[in-house]
C-alpha cells in the first residue's frame, strides 16, 4: 500500500483508493496502525501528521507528503521505493512504453545496433543508474526519478536460446503488462545501495554470499567486502570434457562484444578484490572503443589506461598505438591487465587467418606471463583461442556471452598461477568448453561454507535456501551468527512441504519457529526495508517465492513498535471479513467459539483471544513483516521499548487461546503449515513464559453485587473473578495487588443479559465487561510469580442454583459491585474491600 498525504481533499475519484482523515483524538501511532489496516492500495491521508508518516515509513509502508496535484497524479498511477531518509522517490513506472521507447541504464547498449531490432517506430533511451537522468522530468517537492528500465529483458535475451530480439521483447513486454510487477527485483538495487554503505560504517568485516550479475556494479565501491559465489571454472576441470569441433553459433542479433569485455574486466576486478581488498589500476590492450568504461566509471572512480590504434573515448589515459611485450615494464603494481588483442581478418583466407590468430594467442599469453612475472598485486585477463595449449591447471577459464560462439575464450591469471603445474589441453577440449559452458556470473569466488564467522557481518540474500545446502547447517548458522542479514524461503505451502521447486533447483522452506535466534528480527522484505531507511508502495504478496529476512545483532531489536511492528496485522482479516465472510464479526465469533466461550454478546468489544496473535498465525502468508516471536519474547522478559500509541499488554494465557483458535482454523482449512506453525508458537510461548495453572485452587477472588436481576437459591451469588493456588504466606502479596487494582476493579462496566446451564446441575448467569481487567490482573499476578487462573478458558458467570432451570433472557442490566474479596476455598474470607 502507499499513503499519499494531503492537506486538502481532491475532487477526483481514483480506483482502489480510500480516504483517511487524521484523528486528533488518537496519537500518531494509533493513526498509523489504523491506516495500515485499510484494505485499498492507495490511501489519501488528509490533515496528516508528520510523525504518523515517519512511523509508516519505518514500518516499510511508503508514506509521503505531497504538495501538488501533479505529484499525486504521478505517484498514484505507479509503484515506487521511497528513501525516506534522503527524501528520494524511485518510481517503478513503465508508462514510457506509451512513448514507443525502451529504457536502459547501461550506456554501452546505446552504442550498439540494437535499435535495428526494436519494434517498428520504437527507440532506446539511456536513463542513467537507477534512472538518475530522469530527475529533470519531475519538478517536485521531493527528489524523484524513474528507476524502471528494460535491462532485465535485454540481459535475459542475451542469456536465452532466443535469437529474434524483436519477438523476444514483444513477448516479454506483453508479459510485463499482464502479470504482477516483480517489485522486489526493481527495488532490490536501491536496497543494496543503502544496505552495504550502512553496514561498512559499523562493521570492519562484511561478507556477502551469493552475489549475481545484477550486483555487478553495486560492489565496485567496496573492495573490502569478501564475496562468496559458486567458484570458477578451472583449466583442470576440462578433464571432464570430450573433444568437439568449432560450432559457430550466433547468440545475439545485435553486437554484444562490449558486454563481454565489460564482464571480463568486472570479473577480473572482483577477483582482484578477493585477493587484495583494494582498487586496482586497470590497464587494457585492445578492445577499443570500450564504451562500457563509461558505465563502470559512472558507478565508481577507476583509473583506466588503454592502448589501441583506435579511439577509446572514456579511458583516463589513452595511447593511440600498439602495445608490445617490451612495454610491460611501463605497467605498475596493484593493477589489472586486460589483453584483448585480435587483428582484423580483412581479406585473408581461413588458413592464413587461423595461423595469425594462433600466433597472436601465444603472443597474448607471453605478455600476460611477463606482466605477472615481476611486481606484486597483479591479475591478468587474456584473450585466447581454441588451440593446443599448455596452461596452468589453476588458471580460470571465462566464457561470458558474446555475439557469436566461435573459438574465443578468456583466461584469468594471478601470480600464483605462474608457479603452478601446467597441463596440455587439446584444441577439441577447449572447443567443448566454448560450445557448452557460459560464464553466468562476474563473481567467481569460492562457495560459502555454511558456518559461523565470529569476526564478520554476513549478508546472504537469496543464497542459502537451495537444497544443496544442508538445512540444519543453515538453521545453525542463523541461530549462532551474532551479526548477519540472511534470507531463507518462507514456507508458503498448505501441505507443509519441506522443499519446493524453484526454476531448475529446489529450495528448502522455513518458518520463523525453525530458528532459535537471540536478538534477531525476523521479518519480510518490506519490514527489512524500514530498518534501512527505505519503504515500498507494494507489500509482499504470497507468491510462493517469498523470503524471511533475518537480521541478527541489530540495535533496533528492542524498538518493538518502530520496526517489524504490528502495522497491517489485520489488513488481510479486514479484506476477508468485509467482503467474503458471513459477517464482519466472523473472526471474533470464531475465536470465542473455538475456545468454548459461547457468550458472544459484545464479542467485538470484549474478546477472550488475542487477535494480534491469531491474525499473525492464520494470515502469516500475507503479513510476516510483524516479528511475532520477537513480540512474544520481549513481552515475556518485560523489555518492550514502546515509543507511543495506545498500548495493551496481552496476558500469556490470551496468547495460548489465540494459538488454539488458529489450530482449529487450520484444521478446518486443511492447512498443515498453519497447524504446525500454531503448535510451535504455542510451544514457544510456554517456553519463554513460566505459566503455571491453578487447576487445583485453594483461594479465589469473589465479587459480590448489590443487585442480581434473576431468581436464585444459592446463599450469596457472586462472580468468581479467578482462582489461585498459593501458600498462606503469599496471601499478603495477593491482597497488596488487589489494593493496587482497586480503582480499576470497581470501575468495571459489568452487565448481564441471560441465564444458562453451565453444566448439568449448575445454573448460572452470564457476565460481560470483565475480561480486559481479568487479563490485566492476570499479568500482574504472573509478574509477581503468583499462580492465578486455570488452564481452561475463564468464562465469567454467576452461579444462581445447583438445580436444572430454564434459560431466561432479559434486557442488558448493569451490575453494581458491593464488595470484592479473597476467600479460601472451603474456608473463610481473608480480605474484603468496598468502594
Curated annotation (Swiss-Prot):
Residues 693-835 are annotated as: 2'-5'-phosphodiesterase activity. Residues 246-428 are annotated as: 2'-O-methyltransferase activity. The keyword Methyltransferase applies. GO terms for biological process: symbiont-mediated suppression of host innate immune response; viral process. Keywords: GTP-binding, Host-virus interaction, Hydrolase, Inhibition of host innate immune response by virus, Methyltransferase, mRNA capping, mRNA processing, Multifunctional enzyme, Nucleotide-binding, Nucleotidyltransferase, RNA-binding, S-adenosyl-L-methionine, Transferase, Viral immunoevasion, Virion. It catalyses: a 5'-end diphospho-ribonucleoside in mRNA + GTP + H(+) = a 5'-end (5'-triphosphoguanosine)-ribonucleoside in mRNA + diphosphate; a 5'-end (5'-triphosphoguanosine)-ribonucleoside in mRNA + S-adenosyl-L-methionine = a 5'-end (N(7)-methyl 5'-triphosphoguanosine)-ribonucleoside in mRNA + S-adenosyl-L-homocysteine; 5'-triphosphoadenylyl-(2'->5')-adenylyl-(2'->5')-adenosine + 2 H2O = 2 AMP + ATP + 2 H(+). One of its GO terms (molecular function) is RNA binding. GO terms for cellular component: viral nucleocapsid. InterPro entries: NS2A-like, VP3_Rotav. The active site is at 718 (for 2'-5'-phosphodiesterase activity), 720 (for 2'-5'-phosphodiesterase activity), 797 (for 2'-5'-phosphodiesterase activity), 799 (for 2'-5'-phosphodiesterase activity). The keyword RNA-binding applies. It is found in: Virion. Residues 171-245, 429-555 are annotated as: N7-methyltransferase activity. Residues 556-692 are annotated as: GTase/RTPase activity. It comes from the Viruses. Its EC number is 3.1.4.-, 2.7.7.50, 2.1.1.56. Belongs to the rotavirus VP3 family. Interacts with VP1. Interacts with VP2. Multifunctional enzyme involved in mRNA capping. Catalyzes the formation of the 5' cap structure on the viral plus-strand transcripts. Specifically binds to GTP and displays guanylyltransferase and methyltransferase activities. Has affinity for ssRNA but not for dsRNA. Capping activity is non-specific and caps RNAs that initiate with either a G or an A residue. Together with VP1 polymerase, forms a VP1-VP3 complex positioned near the channels situated at each of the five-fold vertices of the core. Counteracts the host innate immune response thanks to its phosphodiesterase that degrades the 5'-triphosphorylated, 2'-5' linked adenylate oligomers produced by the host cell IFN-inducible 2',5'-oligoadenylate synthetase (OAS). The host RNaseL is therefore not activated. Contains a bipartite N7-methyltransferase domain, a 2'-O-methyltransferase domain and a GTase/RTPase domain. The C-terminus contains a phosphodiesterase domain that degrades the 5'-triphosphorylated, 2'-5' linked adenylate oligomers produced by the host cell in response to IFN stimulation. This is Protein VP3. It comes from Rotavirus A (strain RVA/SA11-Both/G3P5B[2]) (RV-A).
Amino acid at each position: 500500500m502507499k499513503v499519499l498525504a494531503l492537506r486538502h481533499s481532491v475532487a477526483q475519484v481514483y480506483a482502489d483508493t480510500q480516504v483517511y482523515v487524521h484523528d486528533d483524538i488518537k496519537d500518531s501511532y494509533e493513526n498509523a496502525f489504523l491506516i495500515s489496516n485499510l484494505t485499498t492500495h492507495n490511501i489519501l491521508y488528509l490533515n496528516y501528521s508528520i510523525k504518523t508518516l515517519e512511523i509508516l515509513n519505518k514500518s516499510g509502508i511508503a508514506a509521503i507528503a505531497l504538495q501538488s496535484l501533479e505529484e499525486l497524479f504521478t505517484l498514484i498511477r505507479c509503484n515506487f521505493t521511497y528513501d525516506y531518509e534522503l527524501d528520494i522517490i524511485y518510481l517503478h513506472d513503465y508508462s514510457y512504453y506509451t512513448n514507443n521507447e525502451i529504457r536502459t541504464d547501461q550506456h554501452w547498449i546505446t552504442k550498439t545496433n540494437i535499435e535495428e531490432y526494436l519494434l517498428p517506430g520504437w527507440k532506446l533511451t539511456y536513463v542513467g543508474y537507477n534512472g538518475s537522468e530522469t530527475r529533470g522530468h519531475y519538478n517536485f517537492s521531493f527528489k524523484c526519478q524513474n528507476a524502471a528500465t528494460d535491462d532485465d529483458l535485454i540481459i535475459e535475451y542475451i542469456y536465452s536460446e532466443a535469437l529474434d530480439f524483436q519477438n523476444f521483447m514483444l513477448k516479454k513486454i506483453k508479459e510485463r503488462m499482464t502479470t504482477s510487477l516483480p517489485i522486489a527485483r526493481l527495488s532490490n538495487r536501491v536496497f543494496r545501495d543503502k544496505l552495504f554503505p550502512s553496514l561498512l560504517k559499523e562493521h570492519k568485516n562484511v561478507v556477502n554470499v551469493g552475489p549475481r550479475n545484477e550486483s555487478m556494479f553495486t560492489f565496485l565501491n567496496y573492495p573490502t567486502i569478501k564475496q562468496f559465489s559458486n567458484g570458477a571454472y578451472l583449466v583442470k576441470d576440462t578433464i571432464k570434457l570430450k573433444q568437439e569441433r568449432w560450432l559457430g553459433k550466433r547468440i545475439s542479433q545485435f553486437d554484444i562484444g562490449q558486454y563481454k569485455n565489460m564482464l571480463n574486466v568486472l570479473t577480473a576486478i572482483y577477483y582482484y578484490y578477493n585477493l587484495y581488498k583494494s582498487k586496482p589500476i586497470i590497464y587494457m590492450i585492445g578492445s577499443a572503443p570500450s564504451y562500457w568504461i563509461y558505465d563502470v566509471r559512472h558507478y565508481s572512480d577507476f583509473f583506466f589506461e588503454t592502448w589501441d590504434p583506435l579511439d577509446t573515448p572514456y579511458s583516463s589515459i589513452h595511447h593511440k598505438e600498439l602495445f608490445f611485450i617490451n612495454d610491460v615494464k611501463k605497467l605498475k603494481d596493484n593493477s589489472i591487465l586486460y589483453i584483448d588483442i585480435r587483428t582484423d581478418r580483412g581479406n585473408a583466407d581461413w588458413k592464413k587467418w587461423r595461423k595469425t590468430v594462433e600466433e597472436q594467442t601465444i603472443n597474448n599469453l607471453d605478455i600476460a606471463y611477463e606482466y605477472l612475472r615481476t611486481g606484486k598485486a597483479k591479475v591478468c585477463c587474456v584473450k585466447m583461442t581454441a588451440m593446443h595449449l599448455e596452461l596452468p591447471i589453476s588458471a580460470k577459464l571465462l566464457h561470458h556471452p558474446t555475439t557469436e560462439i566461435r573459438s574465443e575464450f578468456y583466461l584469468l591469471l594471478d601470480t600464483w598461477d605462474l608457479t603452478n603445474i601446467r597441463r596440455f589441453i587439446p584444441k577439441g577440449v577447449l572447443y567443448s568448453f566454448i560450445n557448452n559452458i557460459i560464464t553466468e556470473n562476474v563473481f567467481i569466488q569460492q562457495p560459502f561454507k555454511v558456518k559461523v564467522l565470529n569476526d564478520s557481518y554476513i549478508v546472504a540474500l537469496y543464497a542459502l535456501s537451495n537444497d544443496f545446502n544442508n538445512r540444519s547447517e543453515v538453521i545453525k548458522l542463523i541461530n549462532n551468527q551474532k551479526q548477519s542479514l540472511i534470507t531463507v524461503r518462507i514456507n508458503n505451502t498448505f501441505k507443509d512441504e519441506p522443499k519446493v521447486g524453484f526454476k531448475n533447483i529446489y529450495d528448502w522452506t522455513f518458518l520463523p519457529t525453525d530458528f532459535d535466534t537471540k536478538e534477531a528480527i525476523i521479518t519480510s522484505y518490506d519490514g527489512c526495508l524500514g530498518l534501512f531507511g527505505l519503504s515500498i508502495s507494494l507489500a509482499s504478496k504470497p507468491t510462493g517465492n517469498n523470503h524471511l529476512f533475518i537480521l541478527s545483532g541489530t540495535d533496533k531489536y528492542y524498538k518493538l513498535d518502530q520496526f517489524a511492528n504490528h502495522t497491517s496485522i489485520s489488513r488481510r482479516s479486514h479484506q476477508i471479513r468485509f467482503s467474503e465472510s458471513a459477517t464482519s464479526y466472523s473472526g471474533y465469533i470464531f475465536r470465542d467459539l473455538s475456545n468454548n466461550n459461547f457468550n458472544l454478546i459484545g464479542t467485538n468489544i470484549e474478546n477472550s483471544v488475542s487477535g494480534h496473535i491469531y491474525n499473525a498465525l492464520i494470515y502469516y502468508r500475507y503479513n510476516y513483516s510483524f516479528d511475532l516471536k520477537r513480540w512474544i519474547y520481549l513481552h515475556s522478559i518485560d523489555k518492550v521499548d514502546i515509543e507511543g500509541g495506545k498500548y495493551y499488554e496481552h496476558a500469556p494465557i490470551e496468547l495460548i487461546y489465540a494459538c488454539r483458535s488458529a489450530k482449529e482454523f487450520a484444521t478446518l482449512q486443511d492447512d498443515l503449515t498453519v497447524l504446525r506453525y500454531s503448535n510451535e508458537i504455542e510451544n514457544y510461548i510456554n517456553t519463554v513464559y513460566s505459566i503455571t495453572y491453578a487447576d487445583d485452587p485453594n483461594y479465589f477472588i469473589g465479587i459480590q453485587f448489590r443487585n442480581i436481576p434473576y431468581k436464585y437459591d444459592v446463599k450469596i451469588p457472586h462472580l468468581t473473578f479467578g482462582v489461585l493456588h498459593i501458600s498462606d504466606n503469599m496471601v499478603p502479596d495477593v491482597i497488596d495487588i488487589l489494593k493496587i487494582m482497586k480503582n480499576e476493579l470497581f470501575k468495571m462496566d459489568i452487565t448481564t443479559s441471560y441465564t444458562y446451564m453451565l453444566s448439568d446441575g449448575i445454573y448460572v448467569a452470564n457476565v460481560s465487561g470483565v475480561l480486559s481487567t481479568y487479563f490485566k490482573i492476570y499479568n500482574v499476578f504472573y509478574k509477581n510469580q503468583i499462580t492465578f487462573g486455570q488452564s481452561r478458558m475463564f468464562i465469567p458467570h454467576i452461579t444462581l442454583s445447583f438445580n436444572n432451570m430454564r434459560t431466561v433472557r432479559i434486557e442488558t442490566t448493569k451490575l453494581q459491585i458491593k464488595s470484592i474479596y479473597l476467600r479460601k476455598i472451603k474456608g473463610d474470607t481473608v480480605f474484603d474491600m468496598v468502594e
